[in-house]
Amino acid sequence: MFKGSCVALITPFTEDGVNYEELRKLLEWHIKNHTDAILVCGTTGEGSTMTLEEKKEVIKFSVEVVNKRVPVIAGTGTNNTKASIELSKYAEEVGADMVLIITPYYNKTSQKGLYAHFNAINDAINIPIMLYNVPSRTGMNITPLMLDKLADLNNVVAIKEASGDLSQVAKMAELCGDRIAIYSGNDDQIVPILSLGGAGVVSVLANILPEETHNICEKYFLGEVIESRNLQLKYLSLANSLFIETNPIPVKTAMNLMNFNCGPLRLPLCEMEDSNLVILEENLKANGLIK
């Protein structure tokens, strides 16, 4: 387990594959700038448009480069239980510290089916599982009562909670906060979720402000709550600008503007609208990230 900021890392692409030279640079940059954990092949990493072999290679490569300096979390969840198990087993074999398992999407199931999905994955592997709840993308919600049940599975140790519903997070904390670590899945709710006993954030913002996102959490844990809140608010407009279009379109655009060689988005994701690009650039300039 970790406390603090986990970057939901973008995947740098070339026109025909993954840019491993740039990926290595990003991994080293995050460690240098105090990122507390690194998630690869998640939503922000465009995992849904990567081939199985690309995912496997990115997970293996990242584990080798990071070399236990911080935890590496592998995004291995799909809407196919068998496929999720296969990739999760691979992540375990190559040394990932944890897997992130999203709720099934498109072929939405019942709460009973949701439990069966996570239970099957839990029984197939022997490394920690972080659940991922993002109903706006999947059409499915892990309810507090369901999380209370899932928290009894031996490998389920955490949840990335991106419902945006603080009342739901509070109920989760009440029911099973002593058995499962709750991480904010939204950069605009880091401090509110920390105040409910949260363990940190799985962050898009950390792609461009790794140390600052780490500091939001670190100051809170040190009891410097006002300073933590002030940092949350200082970067609020910038964080929101990263969602002016579908994530990860803005953050990958931002990183290329910041002279990282992150390459293109993969269809169906596409370039930003000009009007939104102006807003993103204004926020990057206001925070000294571009000239």
From Swiss-Prot:
A Pfam family it matches: DHDPS
Catalytic activity, EC: 4.3.3.7
Classification via Gene3D superfamilies: Aldolase class I (3.20.20.70)
GO molecular function: 4-hydroxy-tetrahydrodipicolinate synthase activity
SUPFAM superfamilies: Aldolase
CDD domains, per database record: DHDPS
Enzyme class: lyase
Protein's pathway: Amino-acid biosynthesis; L-lysine biosynthesis via DAP pathway; (S)-tetrahydrodipicolinate from L-aspartate: step 3/4
SMART domains: DHDPS
Subcellular localization: Cytoplasm
Disulfide bond sites: none
Record keywords, A-Z: Amino-acid biosynthesis, Cytoplasm, Diaminopimelate biosynthesis, Lyase, Lysine biosynthesis, Schiff base
Active site per UniProt: 132, 160
GO biological process: diaminopimelate biosynthetic process; lysine biosynthetic process via diaminopimelate
Physiological role: Catalyzes the condensation of (S)-aspartate-beta-semialdehyde [(S)-ASA] and pyruvate to 4-hydroxy-tetrahydrodipicolinate (HTPA).
Protein name: 4-hydroxy-tetrahydrodipicolinate synthase
Organism in which the protein naturally occurs: Clostridium perfringens (strain ATCC 13124 / DSM 756 / JCM 1290 / NCIMB 6125 / NCTC 8237 / Type A)
Gene coding for it: dapA
